[in-house]
């Protein structure tokens, strides 16, 4: 009997130590899923992760459209997207949101050792139609960065529910933000264009004051519309076409933005207690014509 009790005590001690080691990671990976969504996938990701130390490399992947009908540089199929999510899960990545990265850079909160930032640019309706359920299925979260003028058109035209070409309405953006799956970013109101300037690039002959005011007017307009029409306050900015300038970073910081996303490929080291390290986050564009092997190689870098 005494031997059995000693064995039971040893087993109990080991169990307690394991819980102490892994419960924080489990909470981090699963806290933002639905209460009933503590799936095997989520648990596996949590147990394959640890909390980061004083710095961590962010892996960010940029998506645009998700469509069954075709693929291309900015379009992936639902099957491809689901396979990507499986790849992330099986390699121990834990999805994080920009607000969590910014908090870590401020010296608050934690990040997993293998943080993954999944982003969707432009605000296509098919992100809600196809990607939302898949993110839920795998216990992952993502950023959606809509273009204001496109959402305004969807609202005014009523043509808001065709996955092939519709963009998200303000109400749909608000619904996604409140789901616990998505966080919302700013992708400008109407600067996602090649003319009169390429994205947010400075126009020829434009003075510093004129350029800064143009940025404040457009980005500020989108910021306010998201707040009023979608009920969200954003602190993440995704650069159209990946174009940025020293003045744009200054303007965004003055407006309270805490993280900016580029189209430069690679991973980004973010340092605890260094807010500036959350700017110029690099991202891999997920080209729908590229194989899963391409993604696996990028993750391994």
Model-found features: residue ranges?
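Non-cysteine beta-strand/loop elements that form the S-adenosyl-L-methionine
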Residues: 144-146, 184-188, 262
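N-terminal Sec-pathway targeting helices
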Residues: 1-17
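Hydrophobic alpha-helical membrane-insertion segments, chiefly the h-region
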Residues: 17-27
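Aromatic- and acidic-residue-enriched segments that line the glycan-binding/catalytic groove
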Residues: 153-171, 203
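A short alpha/beta connector and helix-capping loop motif
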Residues: 130-148
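C-terminal active-site subregion of NodB/CE4 polysaccharide deacetylases
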Residues: 26-119, 126, 193-301
